[in-house]
């Protein structure tokens, strides 16, 4: 999830204090109302399949396998998308252009027990399968309680 900082304090570095305020206020409300996205990073789901298997699904319509790079280095998963040709459609004059292919980069810190098993791109969804193998020495262990049979009975007097 990406956050952008928001400040209501005027920037006095401009030549005129109010020179760009109305445009900035308009952009702020467009972002807050959802007219413009806060972030250009792809949306994703993370699902636990069972005790050891997980799946990360990214929504990246329009990207091809050759435009994606997935790597793991020092337990950090990096997924990058770089569009080779962002203007795939020739147009004399755009009346509205809402489909934009921005380059993106997502990073996830992985525990040392988590391994990426495979990645698959189909119908605009990139699915990564993970496996989390916990070594036996790190699994919780049940400790039984022994009660000796020769307990003394307390006599009432």
Curated annotation (Swiss-Prot):
InterPro entries the record matches: A-crystallin/Hsp20_dom (IPR002068), ACD_IbpA/B (IPR037913), HSP20-like_chaperone (IPR008978)
CDD domains the UniProt entry points to: ACD_IbpA-B_like
Keyword Metal-binding: no
PROSITE patterns tied to this protein: SHSP
Swiss-Prot/TrEMBL keywords: Stress response
Family of this protein: Belongs to the small heat shock protein (HSP20) family.
Protein name, as recorded: Small heat shock protein ibp
Domain sHSP: 35-148
Keyword Transcription regulation set for record: no
């Amino acid at each position: 999830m990406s956050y952008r900082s928001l400040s209501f304090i005027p920037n006095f570095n401009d030549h005129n204090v109010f020179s760009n305020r109305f445009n900035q206020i308009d952009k702020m409300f467009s972002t807050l109302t959802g007219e413009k996205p806060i972030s250009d990073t792809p949306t994703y789901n993370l699902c636990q399949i069972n005790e050891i298997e997980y799946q990360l699904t990214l929504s990246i319509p329009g990207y091809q396998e050759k435009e994606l790079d997935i790597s793991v280095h020092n337990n950090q998963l990096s997924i990058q998308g770089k569009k080779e040709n962002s203007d795939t459609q020739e147009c004399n004059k755009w009346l509205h252009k809402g489909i934009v292919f921005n380059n993106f980069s997502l990073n996830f810190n992985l525990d040392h027990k988590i391994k990426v098993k495979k990645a698959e791109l189909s119908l605009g969804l990139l699915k990564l399968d993970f496996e989390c193998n916990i070594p036996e020495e790190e699994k919780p262990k049940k400790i039984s309680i022994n009660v000796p049979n020769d307990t003394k009975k307390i006599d009432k007097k």
